[in-house]
Structure formats: structure tokens, C-alpha cells
């Protein structure tokens, strides 16, 4: 049974939380053992990974998610403990999620912007270790700078990952900018190979390379590269990290945009291949107004990746999801959004088997808006008057209380499952 820790919530939020608790006491059958990995009779699980030499903990993470997804959908949040609207420290001990519901996200998202120099989003090693110590799952996306223009930075987005100058071909072996890409990968590998817990064991990471490649806003997008060129970039990067740099604690994720024509053929057009991918995902953002069609599309895409993952021995996820940024930044909201999302997913026999969904960050000062203003940029409703009064905090708390969502305390034995690996 999952309850909201009301001691940390203001009076209005406590009222809703107490209502949720009362419902639970009167018979809400929340799964007390949603993490089946905590059962005492667990037998070794056979896994086949991109890296046949992956660490025991990395293999266990994969096996855990394969089983966990049959029982619940884990909640993830980018910059869970390093950015927020209600936190006073960014040392990995506080989060907006925790302040809203009394628990951390199960999946903690970060990015190479905290790994590759100049670490624009701040170093995260200590925070990752804290998340891992409490049994959380770590995922890292890759906003690599444009290798072709990274020395020309000045006016945004020149030189960043959002610089749409085509650079895929020039970043591959034989290309003029391959050494630049290798430099990024070298820093990722050094970070991964030194990311260890207190016992000196490597901490597993779901590494999400070159996401949203079916759009055209990154230098690796569909207008910047052919499907074959993109596949070569993805494969090269995995091979370099795994075989050249000896990274043994990565699961590799592939995450295009959602498709409106939801077919396996469309998903596979730029897919690097089963040999190179452990996790199948997709990224999707939708409107506040008239969003019924978008929610149906989310379910359709989730069902597709779940079926494909089942057939291919992979893990299906929604790697990014949320209200589109322009609506958030305009101050628009949907105080049923989280409930619509979980209701739609769990009602579909395939979509309900995604392992996790992840929403984007809660920028503490927002982002630059028109005429020198700062506008909102957050995806987890915070425990503050604005979100209490507009009903979005209540919506998120209802999502938390749903029997089919899993947060940090709901998952156990993530890294202790016995496994046998297929080579």
C-alpha cells in the first residue's frame, strides 16, 4: 500500500493526501509487492545484452526491468535531485517529486551535459551515487555538441547539439571531425569506468544515444543524415565505448520520436539493429488543449515498442514524455494529465508493459522568454501554492497513488538478481 507523506506537505495538499490514504485503508488494493524481484525464490534469469561482458549489476538491472514491467510502470524524472522548484540543495538529497508525494522517482535521468566538458549542467557523480544507493535506476541521454562547429560557439545554438549543421558523416571514422566525437566518447567512458559505489562496484547506466533522430533539430537528425549514416553513427559509438574503452556498465537505449503512422517499419527505418540496442523507447510531447488524439497516439506507440521488445528480448520504455514546452512556458496546464496518461497506458494489454516513463526537468528559474523574461519550464507539479491551486499537484499525487505506478520505494533488489548471459 502506497501512502503520501503528509508531514512535508502544506495543508491543502495534506487534505488530498489524507483522502488518498483513506481510500487505501478502505480497500484500495495497491500491490504491496509490486517489485517481484524481491521474492525469495528468484532463479537465475538468462539475458542477452549488447555487451556480453556487462557487469553482474548491469545484467541484473536488465533482468529486473524485464520482470518489473509485468507489474507496474516506473516513474522517471530528468534532473530528479539536481534541479527543482521546491528544493534547497542540489546534492542528491532533495527533489520536487519527494516534496510532492514523499518518495523519489524510481528512474533518475541525467545527460552528457553533466559529463562532457564544460559540464554545462553541473557535475553529477555524487548525486548519481546517492540515487544508486537508495536503489534507483540511472539513465543518461546524450546532448553532444556538434563536432563540426563546437569551436564556433557564441550565439546559441551554434556549436551545440541543437546546431543543425549536418555532422554525422564527418564524425565517423575517416571524417575530419571523428577525433572530436571520440573526445566526447572518451569523457563518457572515463566517467562510466570510474562511476563506482562504496564497495568499488561499477554503477549501471542506461545510456541513451542520439535521441529523437527522426526529427531534424539535432545534428544527427533525419534531415542531417540518411538512415544508414545514422545507424553507422550509433553502432560506431557503442562499439567505441564497449570495445575500445572497455565500458562494462551500460545498457544502450534507442529512442526516436513518436510516430503518427505507428508501424514497425517506421520504427525500424533508422534502428541500428538488435545487436546494438538493449532498450527500445520513444520520445513524445503533446498539447494541453484537445489532447485526446495525442494520448491515444502515446498508447499506440507504447504498445508498439512493447510488442517489439517482447519479440526481440529488449526493454520497452517511454524515454521522454510530457506537455510540449511552448504550452508549459505559456503557463498552460492540464490538471488531469497524469491521470489520463496512466489510465490510457494500463488499459492497453501491450502498452501497460513498458518498464518506465520519464518526464523532463524542473528548471528552478525557468528558461529565457520574450523581452528578457523568464518563463516556466517544469514537468513535475511542485508542492507550492500555484500547483495546489490549479489542481496539478493533486493530479500528480493521484498518479503516484495509482496501484500501477512505481516510485523509488516500490522497487527492490534491482541489482541483486542472479543472471546467466547469452554470448
UniProtKB/Swiss-Prot annotation:
Changing residue 212 to D: 10-fold decrease of the catalytic efficiency against 2,4-DNPM. Changing residue 212 to A: Causes a dramatic decrease in the catalytic efficiency against carob galactomannan, azo-carob galactomannan, mannotetraose and 2,4-DNPM. Changing residue 285 to A: Reduction of the catalytic efficiency with carob galactomannan and 2,4-DNPM. Optimum pH is about 7.0. Its EC number is 3.2.1.78. It comes from the Bacteria. One of its GO terms (molecular function) is mannan endo-1,4-beta-mannosidase activity. Homodimer. This is Mannan endo-1,4-beta-mannosidase. It comes from Cellvibrio japonicus (strain Ueda107) (Pseudomonas fluorescens subsp. cellulosa). The lineage of its organism: Bacteria, Pseudomonadati, Pseudomonadota, Gammaproteobacteria, Cellvibrionales.
Amino acid at each position: 500500500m502506497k501512502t503520501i507523506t503528509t508531514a512535508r506537505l502544506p495543508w491543502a495538499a495534506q487534505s488530498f493526501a489524507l483522502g488518498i490514504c483513506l481510500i487505501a485503508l478502505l480497500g484500495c488494493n495497491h500491490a504491496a509487492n509490486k517489485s517481484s524481484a524481491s521474492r525469495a525464490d528468484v532463479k537465475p534469469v538468462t539475458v542477452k545484452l549488447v555487451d556480453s561482458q556487462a557487469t553482474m549489476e548491469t545484467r541484473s538491472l536488465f533482468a529486473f526491468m524485464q520482470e518489473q514491467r509485468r507489474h507496474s510502470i516506473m516513474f522517471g524524472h530528468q534532473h530528479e535531485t539536481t534541479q527543482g522548484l521546491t528544493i534547497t540543495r542540489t546534492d542528491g538529497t532533495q527533489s520536487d517529486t519527494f516534496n510532492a508525494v514523499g518518495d523519489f522517482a524510481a528512474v533518475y535521468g541525467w545527460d552528457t551535459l553533466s559529463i562532457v566538458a564544460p559540464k554545462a549542467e553541473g557535475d553529477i557523480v555524487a548525486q548519481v551515487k546517492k540515487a544508486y544507493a537508495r536503489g534507483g535506476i540511472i539513465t543518461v541521454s546524450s546532448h553532444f555538441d556538434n563536432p563540426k562547429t563546437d569551436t564556433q560557439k557564441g550565439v546559441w545554438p551554434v556549436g551545440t547539439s541543437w546546431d543543425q549543421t549536418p555532422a554525422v558523416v564527418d564524425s565517423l571514422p575517416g571524417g575530419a571531425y571523428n577525433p572530436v566525437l571520440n573526445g566526447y566518447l572518451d569523457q563518457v567512458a572515463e566517467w562510466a569506468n570510474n562511476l563506482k559505489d562504496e564497495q568499488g562496484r561499477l554503477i549501471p547506466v542506461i545510456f541513451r544515444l542520439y535521441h529523437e533522430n527522426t526529427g531534424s533539430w539535432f545534428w544527427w537528425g533525419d534531415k542531417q543524415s540518411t538512415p544508414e549514416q545514422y545507424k553507422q553513427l550509433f553502432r560506431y559509438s557503442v562499439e567505441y565505448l564497449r570495445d575500445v574503452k572497455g565500458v562494462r556498465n551500460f545498457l544502450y537505449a534507442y529512442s526516436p520520436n513518436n510516430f503518427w503512422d505507428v508501424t514497425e517499419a517506421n520504427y525500424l527505418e533508422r534502428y541500428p539493429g538488435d545487436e546494438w540496442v538493449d532498450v527500445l523507447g520513444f520520445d513524445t510531447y503533446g498539447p494541453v488543449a484537445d489532447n485526446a488524439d495525442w494520448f491515444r497516439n502515446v498508447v499506440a506507440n507504447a504498445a508498439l515498442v512493447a510488442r517489439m521488445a517482447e519479440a526481440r528480448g529488449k526493454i520497452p520504455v517511454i524515454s521522454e514524455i510530457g506537455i510540449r514546452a511552448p504550452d508549459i512556458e505559456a503557463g498552460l496546464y492540464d490538471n488531469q494529465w497524469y491521470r489520463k496518461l496512466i489510465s490510457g497506458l494500463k488499459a492497453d494489454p501491450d502498452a501497460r508493459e513498458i518498464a518506465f516513463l520519464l518526464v523532463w526537468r524542473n528548471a528552478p528559474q525557468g528558461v529565457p522568454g520574450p523581452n528578457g523574461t523568464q518563463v516556466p519550464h517544469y514537468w513535475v507539479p511542485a508542492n507550492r501554492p500555484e500547483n495546489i491551486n490549479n489542481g496539478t499537484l493533486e493530479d500528480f499525487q493521484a498518479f503516484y497513488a495509482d496501484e500501477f505506478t512505481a516510485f523509488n520505494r516500490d522497487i527492490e533488489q534491482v541489482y541483486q538478481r542472479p543472471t546467466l548471459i547469452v554470448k
